[in-house]
C-alpha cells in the first residue's frame, strides 16, 4: 500500500480538526500551524507578527519533512490551504519523499453559515473574526475551482453566455413541495427573469439553464421551459438522486460543462451561497431574491 500525505483544504469550522482526529485515531501523524502558533507564543512576543509567521511556516515544514522521512503510512497536513500554490507545494513535497498526495476539500466549507456557527461556538479566544471567515470562504471557492480546472485547456474563442437558475429564479413553486419533482410542471414563470433571458439571447448570448434540481425531473423541466417559450440553448442539471448542496453541485456543473466552452458574462440566481460562488469566480451575478436558505 502506498504511503499517503493528506492535504486538508477548508475554512474554520469546516471539520478539518474532526477529520484529522479520526485519521490520527487510525494511526496517522500530522502537522498543524495553529498548534505551532500556540506552542511558540514567546517568539511572537519577541519578534513581532511578520517574523513570527515566517518562523511558524518554516517550523511546520521542518516538522513535516521529519514525519515524511520517518516513513509513516499516513501524514496529514491540517491547514487551510487556500492557495493553489500552497497545495501544489505539498503535492511536490509528497512526491519527493515517495508519498502519494491526496488533496481533501472539506465540503462543509461551502456552507458559510454552518462554519460561522461552529466557529462562534468555540471558546472566545479561539474565535476567528467573521469577516476573516467570510474572506476565507471566498478564497476556498477560488482555490477549489483553480484546483479542479488546472489541467483544463480553455478554448480561445469561447461563446459568450449567461447562466440562469430555475427554482426561485426563472420558476416559482406555487403549491408543490420543494422535493416534489413530479410536480415541477405546475411552477409559475418569473416574467422579469424571463425578459432578462430574452434580452441576453437577443444579443447573441448562449443561454445555459443550470439547475440543482434532481435529475429525475429533467424531462419535465424541459417540457416546462418549452411550454413557456424560454429561449435556452442547454439545460444542465445534477444527476438523479444527488442530494448534495446546490452550491457544490453548481460548482461541479460549471467545471464539467461550462468553463471550457463558454465565457459567462452574467449569472442569474436567487440563492446567496450560489451567488457568492459566481462572484468568487469573477462573474457578474444578478441576485433576484434574498435566497437565505
What are these regions (language model features)?
Residues 39-43, 81-125:
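ATP-dependent NMP and nucleoside kinases share a basic, alpha-helical "lid"
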Residues 3-9, 100, 107-160, 274-276:
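Conserved GTP-binding G-domain of TRAFAC-class P-loop NTPases and closely related GTPase folds
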Amino acid at each position: 500500500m502506498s504511503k499517503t500525505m493528506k492535504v486538508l483544504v477548508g475554512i474554520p469550522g469546516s471539520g478539518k480538526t474532526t477529520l484529522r482526529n479520526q485519521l490520527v485515531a487510525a494511526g496517522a501523524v500530522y502537522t498543524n500551524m495553529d498548534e505551532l502558533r500556540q506552542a511558540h507564543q514567546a517568539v511572537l512576543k519577541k519578534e513581532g507578527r511578520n517574523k513570527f509567521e515566517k518562523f511558524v511556516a518554516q517550523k511546520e515544514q521542518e516538522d513535516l519533512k521529519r514525519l515524511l522521512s520517518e516513513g509513516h503510512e499516513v501524514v496529514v497536513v491540517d491547514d487551510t490551504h487556500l492557495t493553489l500554490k500552497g497545495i501544489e507545494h505539498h503535492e511536490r513535497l509528497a512526491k519527493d519523499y515517495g508519498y502519494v498526495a491526496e488533496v481533501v476539500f472539506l465540503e462543509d466549507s461551502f456552507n458559510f453559515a454552518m462554519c460561522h456557527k461552529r466557529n462562534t461556538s468555540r471558546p472566545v479566544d479561539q474565535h476567528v473574526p467573521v469577516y476573516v471567515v467570510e474572506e476565507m470562504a471566498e478564497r476556498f471557492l477560488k482555490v477549489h475551482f483553480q484546483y479542479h480546472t488546472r489541467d483544463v485547456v480553455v478554448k480561445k474563442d469561447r461563446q459568450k453566455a449567461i447562466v440562469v437558475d430555475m427554482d426561485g429564479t426563472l420558476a416559482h413553486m406555487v403549491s408543490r413541495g420543494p422535493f416534489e419533482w413530479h410536480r415541477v410542471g405546475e411552477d409559475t414563470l418569473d416574467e422579469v427573469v424571463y425578459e432578462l433571458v430574452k434580452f441576453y439571447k437577443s444579443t447573441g448570448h448562449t443561454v445555459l439553464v443550470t439547475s440543482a434540481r434532481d435529475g429525475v425531473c429533467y424531462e419535465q423541466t424541459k417540457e416546462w421551459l418549452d411550454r413557456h417559450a424560454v429561449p435556452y440553448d442547454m439545460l444542465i442539471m445534477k444527476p438523479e438522486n444527488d442530494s448534495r448542496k446546490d452550491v457544490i453541485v453548481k460548482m461541479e456543473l460549471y467545471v464539467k460543462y461550462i468553463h471550457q466552452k463558454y465565457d459567462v458574462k452574467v449569472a442569474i440566481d436567487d440563492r446567496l451561497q450560489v451567488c457568492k460562488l459566481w462572484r468568487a469566480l469573477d462573474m457578474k451575478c444578478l441576485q433576484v431574491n434574498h435566497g437565505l436558505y
